Amino acid sequence: MLTAMLFRPWAGQIIARIGPIKVLRIILLINAMALVLYGFTGLEGYLIARIMQGVCTAFFSMSLQLGIIDALPEKYRSEGVSLYSLFSTIPNLLGPLIAVGIWHVENMSIFAIVMIFIAVTTTLFGYRTTFANTQKEVSPKDEVLPFNAMTVYVQFFKNKALFCSGMIMILSSIVFGAMSTFIPLYTVREGFANAGIFLTIQAITVVIARFYLRKYVPSDGLWHHLFMMIVLTLLMVASVIVAFGPHIVSIFVYISAIFIGITQALVYPTLTTYLSFVLPKIGRNMLLGLFIACADLGISLGGVLMGPISDTVGFKWMYILCALLVTIAMTLSKIRQRQSVSKAS
């Protein structure tokens, strides 16, 4: 994840120069090599494979998302991003089940065969798709950018739309990361609910919400403050419910998992679609890469930052702090609304 986060802005720059189709073809081959490494190497090979997959993740996701943004009409852009997010979530549900099955078989040959199968099928399917659409590809002109892959990080603070959206994404992702990381420990220590059921409900909700609610994600380039407030309120309420989970009926804890799933399904597509409209066209790909890196950063901080906090003040107060972080995100949404109104006037 760290590798992907660092490479995303650079990936956006490369894609802007040579186009998403060519990048996708190269990344499919590198990903196949990384998957094969898993089946035939030890720990050293795993480290190399993980770094390779981090690079692949950065370029692969950027290629697909930028391709979707460029290819779809504006009114369908949010639906395209939502469906991309949906299909990127499904492997996270099926992957652990496959891994557990291979683990119980206790045969590394099966693991190697599965990795090779995934590598071959993804490469063949990806190449078939890109070849079928080659005639639609337009070679992008080289952009003269006012920043590069290193100085682009300064733009996070200079661009008001990017800053507000990025901070909302970071704060929300911190809560998502804290939920998925510490819910198992919290429920076992305090003896309430069931972490497996909670996380399953959350994951299923993400999938269902991204499919059935995709048409409600704004796709007009305007900042919809009321929509963001409703979505973020669900996350804030869920954080408070989880914080007081040991003292309430478990059914409310499971309902909070639904709230978290809905928020997780809607926040990312909403902000990504909005930025695809308002960011300057010159350097847009790099700036979008920087925003997507914010989601990676937030998930990481949810475990790295909130872990020591929970050790110091306990899980209850850590999740109350999560609710306060969401409140800050709601404040940023209000600030962005005022900025949009003043700019329009």
PLM region descriptions:
Residues 44-53, 251-259:
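Paired small-residue
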